[in-house]
């Protein structure tokens, strides 16, 4: 009996030691990858002939890509150039043959997570292939998965809230979906085209800007969050190009804007600039506590290149959201983000290869 107990105890200890060694080894390698500035890329392919992507616009200010999947079905995927990790929402797993193609991997050395390879989800080869995320590490079971994929996150409180206020969202496509490609987003005509490059010869045109990206020593993009500039009241302000910027309205906000919608397109501005605008322009419209994140201000005129457009709504965000948060994925500290409340006035072409953006009206 004592021998059996000893063998059992030794077996348990050995098993625990094995898992401990595995866990700390994987954590070590994952940390080295996350600290590295090396860039993970998908197989390079030539730019294809420009292609109109099936898209659904919301109020002409935000958009969902209609991803074609099996059984002639589609996935409504929210397009967000300012977003992070791309994912497939858990509520979409039963569409088409998605469930048959789901895989289970390991993150952080121990946590299981479901994912689907992008090639197993999207059936139209004309659709752009997202860039693999260099910092989000999934292993299957031990080897790192380097192919483009969409993870299926657990249905936790933050995701539940996101899907509650945007129930049509079946997938989320963040920065890595847009990287390595060129896009034309025509807001007035509610059309999106991909493979629409801007050559370096465009740089001297008045309504073309050079974008900033966080890069490594080899000048390769580490992240895909683009910085650019806008001008308000004579001041040039660095901002994030953010197609997914969204206001989540409070009940007070719904009353102020005369809508029963839970969300509207938005743009964001740092509190220091917001407070300056409030002090210098008390006549500008102001909507206190209209957004769950804070107050909203209406700026009459915003200048992009030679164009003056407006009015444009901005939601206040604390300065630390930019100086301590977004700086981790951007080339500089920006002071805000321009979303659909400003972009709706333009036909925008953005090229992640030449790092150029052009605004047309």
Where are each of the predicted segments found?
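Pepsin/retropepsin-fold aspartyl endopeptidases
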Residues: 2-361
